[in-house]
Amino acid sequence: MEKINFKIFDMWDISEIQIVDPGLRGVINLEPKLILKSHGRNVVKHGQTKVNVVERLMNKIALTGHRNKKHRIELGRSTGKYSRNMKIVLDAFQIIEKKTGKNPVEVLVRAIEKISPRDETTIIEYGGARYPQAVDVSPIRRVNLALKNLVHGASDKAFGKKKKLSQSLAEEIILAYEENGESSALRKKKESEAQADSAR
């Protein structure tokens, strides 16, 4: 039986995309699907590795108002409505393809590889005192932080402005792909790794 190779949104082929970072090969899922909606089938430990990376990006858009554990910002453009979040990502991908001339899914994967932090700090308590301790970031958390920082950077740039969230998301992904210093996700990565270096 011939294997059907679905394209993302029936527009972009992802069969040829290779993950360069060896630490992320097992956690960035590029399984070809026509409809990127898993309906919560993978809500188990490490189940995120079975969810396509584009769907994970769409899921992050529903939480752009959260900063740490609190919902601080009300942004009506990004809600829990799946069809709306899918439209934002689709529009962003079309902008990326128009500006770069490349497959937007590949641009997203390269951006994730470049902005996913390798080190961060945690707090350890010793003798009643609390000390920051540098720790390595697990591969799944690296991807989660990269996607979260991309979406937060995009929503912050669109908040209170006429710019659409899809436009700012496309810009943020392109800046991260180019390793441009204006990318807020790249700045957060460098900040996290600098804090970890100082806590060693």
Regions found by a protein language model. Name each.
Residues 1-86, 90-200:
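Strongly charged
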